[in-house]
Amino acid sequence: MRRKCTDSLIYWKKNPGRKPLILQGLRQTGKTWLLMDFGNKQYEHTLYINLETDRSATDYLSVPHDPQEVLLFLETCAGKPLRPASSLLILDNIQCIPQISTLLTSIALDFPQYHIASIYKGVVNSDSFSVHDFDILTLYPLDFEEFLWANAEFALTREIRNHFSDFSSMGKKLHEKALSQFRLYLLSLIHI
């Protein structure tokens, strides 16, 4: 499956001025899946830690530590090597640790070569996270075009885009197919 936000993640990875990433968005929009898929395709190693379920990580990170010690701890927790530029560290549910902003900022200042992405359930509070210290992306629910991609309706996607761009009408059969897919899309939204 492809999400439009993936292009922004690739840009983030390649950006030499990259800051720790916060992927924010509503529940059940695919934030964890997106970062795991991105990590598995773009990096040698993807380290994932869920701060909502990993009590030892949450307890450890809730107390101030030296950034290098934190990186070693997270590497041990994830059970995979954390290497500059070839590993992606994903911290899920960072809203569970109120002072995580300070910790991530310290790591980024001391070790900018590490790629750190985090997942925030909801919308980041600007009082807790400085927009100058983080790259923040928002993942929205699947849109209709992404739904068509997920269902391998590439030709239909292209036709809709072409007719929209040209301000031209679709043929009846094509329009019926587009409406049928749109109804399925609306039903999928109900089940989120």
PLM feature spans:
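Phosphate-binding site recognition
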Residues: 1-190
